[in-house]
UniProtKB/Swiss-Prot annotation:
Organism the protein comes from: Dictyostelium discoideum
Name assigned to this protein: MIP18 family protein FAM96A
GO biological process: chromosome segregation; protein maturation
ATP-binding is among the record's keywords: no
Gene3D superfamilies in the cross-refs: 6.10.250.1280, Fe-S cluster assembly (FSCA)
Length: 150
């Protein structure tokens, strides 16, 4: 379900991901305090003025792009489903946003025992594709991001 956004902001992104169900607990990521609006950064090309410079490149290179950075906090420091939660967040955003987006997802600093290793994994395109090719992981992600009536 692609939404029609003129300019995307962190409130829009939070509204998209807040109702994702946790893969282990019968609650949403918002209810478990895994995601928070304040942990989201969005730079939408429609919101860039002439003095802004993303990644020290010319803004024209980014016409039509939206940059989204999301931090999340697993429920426990040894959460084995942190990569799955990141996949759910990424797939939910991709399902809703109409424009090309660069999405970066990270575990909030100091909240997981292997956060550096997992952060590399959850932002590696090849690993993301490989994970979603696994039928069990794919079905779990689809189940977690499925819309319910709220």
């Amino acid at each position: 379900m692609i939404m029609n956004y003129n300019v995307i902001d962190k409130i829009d992104v939070f509204d998209i991901i807040r109702h994702i169900k946790d893969p282990e607990f019968p609650k949403t990521l918002e209810e478990l305090k895994v995601v928070n609006e304040d942990w989201i950064t969005v730079i939408d090309n429609n919101d860039i003025n002439d003095s802004d410079d993303i990644n020290n490149n010319n803004n024209e290179n980014y016409k039509g792009y939206c940059f989204i950075k999301i931090l999340f906090q697993p429920t426990v420091p040894h959460c084995h489903l942190a990569p799955t939660i990141a996949l759910c967040i990424r797939e939910k955003i991709k399902e809703y946003l109409p424009k090309r987006s660069k999405i970066e997802i990270y575990i909030k600093k100091g909240t997981h025992q292997t956060e550096d290793e997992i952060n590399k994994q959850i932002n590696d395109k090849e690993r993301i594709i490989a994970a979603l090719e696994n039928p069990e992981i794919f079905q779990l992600v689809k189940k977690c991001i499925k819309e319910d009536d709220y």
